[in-house]
Amino acid sequence: MTESPTTSPATGSGAAAPDSDAPPYRYTAALAGRIEGSWQDTWAKLGTFNVPNPVGSLAPTDGTPVPEDKLFVQDMFPYPSGEGLHVGHPLGYIATDVYARYFRMTGRNVLHALGFDAFGLPAEQYAVQTGTHPRTRTEANVVNFRRQLGRLGLGHDSRRSFSTTDVEFYKWTQWIFLQIYNAWFDPAANKARPIAELVAEFDSGARSLDDGRNWSELSAGERADVIDSHRLVYRADSMVNWCPGLGTVLANEEVTADGRSDRGNFPVFRKRLRQWMMRITAYSDRLLDDLDLLDWPEPVKTMQRNWIGRSTGAKALFAATGADGAALDIEVFTTRPDTLFGATYMVLAPEHELVDELVAPAWPDGTDPRWTYGAATPGESVAAYRRAIASKSDLERQESKAKTGVFLGSYATNPTNGKPVPIFIADYVLAGYGTGAIMAVPGHDQRDWDFAHEFGLPIVEVIAGGDISEGAYAGDGVLVNSGYLDGLDVAAAKEAITARLEAEGRGCARVEYKLRDWLFARQRYWGEPFPIVYDSDGRPHALDEAALPVELPDVPDYSPVLFDPDDADSEPSPPLAKATDWVHVELDLGDGLKPYSRDTNVMPQWAGSSWYELRYTDPHNSERFCAKENEAYWMGPRPAEHGPQDPGGVDLYVGGAEHAVLHLLYARFWHKVLYDLGHVSSREPYRRLVNQGYIQAFAYTDSRGSYVPAEEVVERDGRFFYRGPDGEIEVFQEFGKIGKSLKNSISPDEICDDYGADTLRVYEMSMGPLEASRPWATKDVVGAHRFLQRVWRLVVDEQTGETRVVDGAGRDLPTGTLRLLHRTIAGVSEDYAALRNNTAVAKLIEYTNHLTKEHRDAVPRAAVEPLVLMLAPLAPHMAEELWLRLGHTTSLAHGPFPVADPAYLVEDTVEYPVQVNGKVRGRVTVAADADRDTLEAAALADEKVLAFLAGAQPRKVIVVPGRLVNLVV
């Protein structure tokens, strides 16, 4: 064990005890700092929080089997920014530490570790500005984060920590990429299978090509094209979010609602580029359906359901003729096939692949001028319109009240009635949803009605019940003006018209999703290189696993080519393209030594976080990303514990709700592919998810709305002032999330210096429910510190430093103390297990105050030792120190946590309110097992009740056991 740092007086009082006359052994910031540093050193030396694995380098060396009762607790790992932590960051880390410490003390084998999500744009931008390698900056930031987190006393197994930028970590990120690349999704099996099995099926004739070609007659290149089109990772010429100001392509989730980059606030343009994509859409149904198996907050599940966006409807084909005279079919998806007879025009997304083929060379005679966008030809109008909408985000396009569009000069044929319908492009139709084309039914869709009204297009009623002259009617009714559907209700009409479309070969039933495939490439430097090379024909080839890792090379500078933020026509040029010696290589991929070029894109920052939970289970394994035995132990399904449908996964995952449709969806996708391929036993990465709230603080803005440093603001007479470069100005107070952007960050180092880490831990846990946001107030931290001082005084004499407890059996405690002790044990145990740390703190304060009041001279050991043990998850340093001073020679980190005696949880007496005609007029206390007659007699004998009755006799006495007595007069 350790020598107590309290054997010397608490010199240096710190902010929490400014009085120089304070007793020499008072619990002050200085003493807390010595205690905390000492115990952190002891934990590190003894490996207190090291947890064994079933197999591998972290398995017990003596062959001892690991305990069956395990618990895997995980935090969303931090990005190591240059600013370091603020007091909002530790909220979730402390909460999970309390949870893990509690269950560790109850005897469970607890895995709790923390790594760093270290790839990303900030380090790269710093490298661009300074010429410093991003790794240098990142590693320095990680060192600072580890220092700050270390001060908090988090009980992590430090052997399991890593950064996603570690070569030995991203080697396995690349390996998992190859597993996904070398897999395809078999719809019949509803799972991923190795691509080699697909090739074998084509070779054997068990599977035929969809286009009718003969596999055996295809060239090697044609076969490769077929196989590549089935892969779960593929290249596609797709519409992407191009940000010239950042020099890279962004995922949809990285673009703000107003069409700008989430980082840097640059304009973002829709542009067609050839990019790596991951076929996450193949898993839409499983991602959606398996949400029901997860213990996650319902709002997060709802966000994922909405993001996936499953819709049931029908596909319909509208025949058209291209500008060259070729016959074309325009495919639409609709959830309302019953309204097909009301389709009076079509709208395609401006980016739709058929637009250019459908543009007529000239305007048809009689074209309405409103349809031409003021251009002389359809081609000119389309080009002008595309330029006009290039910078609009998808959200802007859909929410815009002003309807704009351009007629292509061509017509399609409505498959239900054979009538011609003009074809438009308009920005409110998105290429990424459905087929990128809609049949417009203005009589029953308000957006279509608005567009038709703006452009003078026909509006036809096909469902009776509304007034379509005033607006679209979206309600139910019977079909009218719909031929063979007339008189049917909506449900019957949907069924009938879908059957007719199928019979005529012009459509079929269809399920569509909002979810799009995952854009998986960035034109940056600081990311995982792709394990892909290209031959002289530009065809991609996966590297052999033995060639991993593909390490990042040094480059002359780290910036992608940046463009004028408004230059929508610019093209990406990644930084890795500058490393020509690295890009151009000669390799033998099985057919002799040949020249190849490496892929110069890098993976997005989401790559490492899509699987990192698995690496915690086996962080030093050089043969696999994790041993199957270790994954099965820590993450495998446990139906006996969690039910027959348990998907497995991390037992508790805590992080922000802002990751609901990014990290969490991507991680689920990767995990399901690994499960399908037999690499993991769990179907889901995270069995249980909890979203912590935010810590908020006051921020201050000047008259222009710009934020000023909160710590430099002074208050006078209810107004706030800031002294800037031009003198003092008045600023205005608002409330917001703590962070760099609001200039209101408070470092945890500051609080640790002034009060100690245990005080910070107790304060943050006492502020409110974990899931709720809560206001930070530094002035209130002292309350948590005073509570810990009271606990300290129960054990330690502040004048002498001696222990001031008295021995004695627990049964010798006063009855009131015994009952409160066991109620506290029961309540705190339930609170810790349910992450209700704020109410646990309240119960501990109540019990501490009781001991302080009832045992002024000396506290019985039997009363105070359980308090120290209960305090340990919240304030572990102080608890360890007091445990040592109470004469124990081993750490309390592994328990025992006290257990409540049920005998002391039963109340001997119960207080009943006594009502007269429904209003409380008195209260009586009776034995808990009192019968009805005893309770009635006590109520009628109460002085206040008698005074109110004034001699009247109740006509009826109502007794509700355990709740109340009501006298009716």
Swiss-Prot record:
Keywords tagged on the record: Aminoacyl-tRNA synthetase, ATP-binding, Cytoplasm, Ligase, Nucleotide-binding, Protein biosynthesis
Region listing for Disordered, in residue ranges: 1-23
Motif ('HIGH' region): 78-89
Gene Ontology molecular function: aminoacyl-tRNA deacylase activity; ATP binding; leucine-tRNA ligase activity
EC number: 6.1.1.4
Keyword Protein biosynthesis: yes
Subcellular location: Cytoplasm
InterPro entries: aa-tRNA-synth_I_CS, Leu-tRNA-ligase, Leu_tRNA-synth_edit, M/V/L/I-tRNA-synth_anticd-bd, Methionyl/Leucyl_tRNA_Synth, Rossmann-like_a/b/a_fold, tRNAsynth_Ia_anticodon-bd, Val/Leu/Ile-tRNA-synth_edit
Recorded catalytic activity of this chain's protein: tRNA(Leu) + L-leucine + ATP = L-leucyl-tRNA(Leu) + AMP + diphosphate
Class of the enzyme per the UniProt entry, highest EC level: ligase
Residues binding ATP, per UniProt: K740
Biological process, per Gene Ontology: leucyl-tRNA aminoacylation
PANTHER family given in the database record: LEUCINE--TRNA LIGASE, MITOCHONDRIAL, LEUCYL-TRNA SYNTHETASE
UniProt name for this protein: Leucine--tRNA ligase
Organism: Mycolicibacterium paratuberculosis (strain ATCC BAA-968 / K-10)
